[in-house]
Amino acid sequence: MFSKLAYSVFEQSIKDYHQFDNVDQPINNPYTKEQFEHLLYLKNWIDTVQWHFEDIIRDPNIDPVAALTLKRRIDASNQERTDMVEYIDSYFLQKYSHVKVKEEAKINSESPAWAFDRLSILALKIYHMSEEAHRAEASQEHRDKCQEKLNILLEQRTDLFTAIDDLLTDIENGDKFMKVYKQMKMYNDDELNPVLYHGKK
């Protein structure tokens, strides 16, 4: 199952990040650029670093100047995340370019790469909820509540595995077709963000 392969790469990325747990640590992607897993690993690494950016910026004692700098790093990370999704969709467009789409084929509400994006974020939720469910210094009540949440996340993972694999099978069989829209991020574009383009005057 393609979804489980992707998830195993996401888990590896998360595990590798937490060896040092530092948002500034360099990535050491174990896959070559020719492998699809390289994109998956990089995608999740970006997600994992951003997850920890979001933790840091919520510190009530954060220095305002540091918070502004971090907010800009988060914006840049969001753009990277979107770019990676588009790279992954490009892979699938190429992979299924030979498929003869059936006349009655339908379009899906999201592309394969955005489904994998959700799976990547879900892997992070599961990792951190599992940490909380097993945190020794936490109260039993806290651990029990986190275990209940973890069980729901694991059920969601099973459902998402099925949904992703069904989608890929449908595309491969011509029952569904891919249509990818380049994400029109506006806040980083000085031609589209009013604050930025007014500032240029």
Task: Say what each PLM segment does.
Residues 1-201:
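Anionic, Ser/Thr-rich low-complexity intrinsically disordered regions
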